[in-house]
Structures are given as structure tokens and as C-alpha cells.
């Protein structure tokens, strides 16, 4: 069976109109919840530290945080320690959220025959992750679902020729399996490669 001239033209136009670039933005989930927990932790840490210092100087730095019945050693010094840890940890986590650490994109560019995986790192030199491969090296897509007690991990990997599988989607908060399959099939369809099991 041969195509008519008009059908050939339409087929070529369809190929020309096909997207040449697939880009998936990777964003942090549950930012509002993380903001809430870290602000609560920060305020709690400040409260502990103030009570610990108040027990040391024998005077309440803030009137509603009563430290009159707390002995500096061992209770006060312990509260100072936990308060300092809470403050430092929450500030670090807030900094990670503000700077978008772990966010980035997956880009598949047929024009350049190039795949780019970019993730933002912490502030500092060479902390960002920027991985590139030729599209020809991609052999397939692999979906992985792990049930570890109460923790469900959902991952999508690229199977790279002569290399370890490369994670491109990593979800600590589970989504519907159909949604995960949809994301994986979008990449597989664009690259024309197979999807392999769970």
C-alpha cells in the first residue's frame, strides 16, 4: 500500500509539528506543611533556649516563660542544648526550602539529541547537579515502587547504556500509580523507548 502525495505531505507536516523538547519541572511537594513544622520547631527551640538561659541567670527573660522552678543543672542546660539544636535544624530546613534545594528539571531535547537532568544544590560552589547524556544512550524507562513499613517510595529511572539506572523522579509522598505511570509513559512515548516493570 502506497500513500498518495497529499498523505505524504500530511505525514511530513505531522512529523515537523511534533514537539522537539520535553521538559518536566521538578518541584518540592508539601511546602506549606514543611514551612509549618519548621516554624513550630524554630519557635519551640527559641522557647527552650530562653527558659534554659533564664534558669542560669535566675530571672525570666520573658515573663510568660517561667523558669523559676527549673534548676540550671541538669534541666536548664539540657533545655539550652535541645533549644539550640532545634533552632539550628529548623533554620537549615527553612534555608533548604527558600533556596529550592532538590528542585530542578528533566529536559529531553531531540534537536540537540541531549538529555539534561538538573537539580539545585545548597548554596556554595559546585553543589548543583547537572547530568547530560545523549538520547541515543537511553534504553528504556523503569518504574520502581517500594513499600518500607509505613514509608512508600515511588521512583522512575532512566536505563542508560552501560551505566547504572539514573533516577529522574523520586517521590517520598506517594501518588496514584496511574499518575506515576502517566509521567513515565510521557517520557517513554517522547523518546520511543519501552517501560519496564516495577
UniProtKB/Swiss-Prot annotation:
This is Photosystem I assembly protein Ycf4. Pfam families: Ycf4. It is found in: Plastid, Chloroplast thylakoid membrane. Belongs to the Ycf4 family. Seems to be required for the assembly of the photosystem I complex. One of its GO terms (biological process) is photosynthesis. It is a multi-pass membrane protein. The chain crosses the membrane at residues 35-57, 70-92. Keywords: Chloroplast, Membrane, Photosynthesis, Plastid, Thylakoid, Transmembrane, Transmembrane helix. Its main location: plastid. GO terms for cellular component: chloroplast thylakoid membrane; photosystem I.
